[in-house]
Each structure stands twice: as C-alpha cells, then as structure tokens.
Amino acid sequence: MKSFYHYLMKYRHPKPKDEISHFANAAYEDHSFPKASTDYHELSVYLELNGDYLSSMTTFDEAFEQYDVEVKKK
C-alpha cells in the first residue's frame, strides 16, 4: 500500500494554489516526516509536535481523508 507521504507528493507544486499543496511542499522539505506511515494517529501526533508548517491540522485531516478514500479503501 502506498504511504501517506507518497500519496501527498502528488500534490507538490512549485506554485501551490491550495493548503494541501503547501502541506505537500513542506512535508517534502521535512526530512523527519514519517515517510513510510499509513497510520492516521502516528502522522497526526508527529504533525502536532513537528508540523509548524501546517496552518491548521484541518489541512492534514482533509488530505488524509482523501488518501483514505483513494488509496486505503481500494
């Protein structure tokens, strides 16, 4: 199964137009991001402690919900 990080990278963009693209760009720059994780709780805890680049955890929640629908539910 594709990790959340791998899924999120499809939203990277040199000129981000939305919060998820900003998140993807920042996660790419975050060398400690749990790149292999598929677990909501693990990612959420990491971002709460280290995700100062997120304007709101809602952005993560929305991205993870999309990931859950598109990848995990297959």
Curated annotation (Swiss-Prot):
Coiled coil: none
Database matches in InterPro entries: UPF0346 (IPR010673), YozE_SAM-like (IPR023089), YozE_SAM-like_sf (IPR036806)
Pfam families (alphabetical): YozE_SAM_like (PF06855)
Source superkingdom: Bacteria
Family of the protein in this entry: Belongs to the UPF0346 family.
Protein name (record): UPF0346 protein BPUM_1890
Organism whose genome encodes this protein: Bacillus pumilus (strain SAFR-032)
